[in-house]
Amino acid sequence: MICNLCPRKCNAQRSESSGGGFCRMGTNPVIARVAPHFGEEPCISGANGSGTIFFSGCTLGCVYCQNYEISSLHRGREITPQELADCYKRLEEQNVHNINLVTADHFAPAVVKSFEIYKPKIPIVYNCSGYTSPKILNMLDGIVDIYLPDFKYSNNELALKYSLAPNYVETATVAIKEMLFQVGFPQFDDRQMMQKGIIVRHLILPSHTKNSMEVLDILKKNYGNQILVSLMGQYIPMGNANKYEKINRKITRREYQKVKDYYMMLGFDGFTQELDSADRKYVPEWDF
């Protein structure tokens, strides 16, 4: 196929097992881990875990990615849409609260096909970078119950420098508006597990508190309290972060508190992640 799925519109040739373009992946999904995951927000992980499938490859190129081994080095195992549907069944049998697809944009057609084969009875979570095209979101309409996008940057200069992502701000802003149109306001069951809605995540970068505060301004202006916002303090310099002096360290408590205070002042509903989460032990163990 000639691929223009993601906002990059590479016009690249992709076969089932190989591909050109930015992601350099074929059209068959490549996965690195399938298991209950307990590191998400409480309303996603709950007591039984989120049935998480980590996909290899990515449409971003974050220099600090903690999942660098799978996002950039593409380690993982190739599966078919049928095998992906079988993963949903196995996870559902483990009594997880939801099925959680992590970084699946570049495999969207295969993901849609897998849900035509088997649609779980539990909510579907789509965990993505926010750098998602309307084309992909239209494909997912009616399938996804909960969107879990990032909103990383307040300006495109930073997005290009650290994630190789042109027009990130405009793309993510439009994407989240479409997500909101599809799934609406947050809804919870009687156990306070999320059933519908959006949680927008923002990772605080060292030396960039201004970026974080401006991101929060963008979220407040565009979405108000129609979304939940998860403020993340788990940054660890991984991947190629050692080549960038300003981000080659963890965030300080002062940086974290400055952004958290601003988050609270703006009156967001959501979650704030403490600094002790910035530990390599929280990086998932891959199963190739």
Please place each PLM-identified region on the residue numbering.
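Auxiliary Fe-S-binding modules of radical SAM enzymes
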Residues: 1-19, 180, 184-288
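Conserved radical SAM core fold
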Residues: 108, 131-134, 151-169, 198-200, ...
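Non-cysteine beta-strand/loop elements that form the S-adenosyl-L-methionine
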Residues: 141-156, 226-235
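Conserved Radical SAM active-site core
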Residues: 24-146, 155-157
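Conserved non-cysteine loop/helix-boundary elements of the Radical SAM core domain that shape
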Residues: 70-83, 103-109, 113, 118, ...
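A cross-domain feature marking catalytic cores of carbohydrate-active enzymes
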Residues: 55, 103-105, 126-130, 151, ...
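Short low-complexity, flexible loop/linker segments enriched in glycine and/or proline
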Residues: 115-116, 140-141, 163-165, 284-288
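Hydrophobic faces of well-ordered beta-strands that scaffold small-molecule active sites
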Residues: 51, 99, 124-126, 147-149, ...
